[in-house]
Amino acid sequence: MRFEDQMKKAAPEQLWQEYCGFLDMSISEYMYTQRRLMAEQLSLWTPSGLGKKLLRGEAPRTIEELRAQLPLTTYEDYAEVLLPKRSEMLCTEPAIWIQTTWEGGLRPIKQAPYTRSMLDTYCHNLIACMMMATATRKGTFHFRRGDRVLYGGAPLPYATGLMPSLANEEIRLTWLPDSNEHSDLSFSERIKKGFAMGM
């Protein structure tokens, strides 16, 4: 159910618990959750082509085994798979490829695959951020359908370009300026236009 519809049926406190309940976790509860999620990712990633390549045939079953078998990596370790967008090497087909700069612009770009599951998590976290940003106290937040939001992020194919479309899957907001209508504007032009529209 969309967040917009949930707002009509559930008490604000219930929504707060669903999206921001992690704030009440103890450090041990939080770490238990993080370890469980990491174990899920490990089981998905290990048998993938990229997992096999980086692990050199090893199959770690725990986070500790992964740390022992695979030291810290850099984007360089993934570049030959991610730059040409070799999705057959990944554990899940990407829904979209996002790009960002690499080494402060010394190299042209980095590509990163985002699965539908990652987009859902991104959206959930975005709603949680909006709840916390508009909260006056725990369980009380103030944003509604149609609220105007100054959009100061870079457009797609950058990660911030996902915000308007993902948020609008859950709650219809008015983005200033609309990222689809004004995608041809430069970053500074969009910021100026957004401020002008908001005044």
Residue ranges of model-derived segments:
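Nucleotide 5′-phosphate-binding alpha/beta core
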Residues: 1-99, 103-199
